Amino acid sequence: MGFLTPMHELGEYLKWTRSGEIQLPDFQRGYKWEDERIRQLLVTVLRGHPMGAVMLLKTGNSQVRFKPRAIEGVHLTPGTEAKYLLLDGQQRLTSLTQALSGNGVVATKDSRGRLLDRRYFVHMETALSDSNRVDEAVISVPADGVVRSNFGKDVVLDLGDQDKQHEHGYFPLNLLYGDFMSWILELQNPAPGKHFHD
C-alpha cells in the first residue's frame, strides 16, 4: 500500500465534499469547531497561507470497510458513494465546506458552548486597504445577516440581502468559490470587487 501526496486547490475539495466524493468514516467524531476558530481559518484562506494537511483513504478496499456519512451540512442523495474517506482535517474541511459554499450558514458554537448558526463576510475596502487588516475585515454574523445590540432591539449592521451587502461593502464568503462574479457586477463600482477576488 503506497502513499500519495497530491496537491489540490481548495475549490476542488469543496466540490468533492458537496458532491459526496469525500465523506467521513463512521468512526469520526462530530463537528465541534467554535465560531472564532472558523473565522480565523477563513482569514488564513484569504491570506493564502497553508492550513494544514488533509488525509484521505481511497474507498473500495475489501479489507477496510467503514460506513461513510456526509460531511456535516452537506445533504446527499441516499446511496451516494464516497470515493474517499476523510481521516484527518475533518474540522477544517467541514468548516470551509459550510462557510464557503451553499448558503454559507455554519452550525457552530460560541466560546461558552452555546449553539449558533453563523455566516461569514469580508469587508472588501478594509481587506484591500492593507494585507495586515484581513483579520479585521472578516466578520461573523448571525445566519439572518443582521447584527443586533440592546438585547436584539437595535440593528447595528444589516447584511440580510444582497442590496444591503453592497451598500455596506461586505462580500459573502459563501460566494468566494461560487457565483462571486454576479455579486461583484451588481456593485455600483465593481472594480474593487474584481480586485478583491483576484
Question: What spans do the regions from the language model cover?
Answer:
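Basic- and aromatic-enriched surface patches that contact anionic nucleotides/nucleic acids
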Residues: 2-35, 39-198
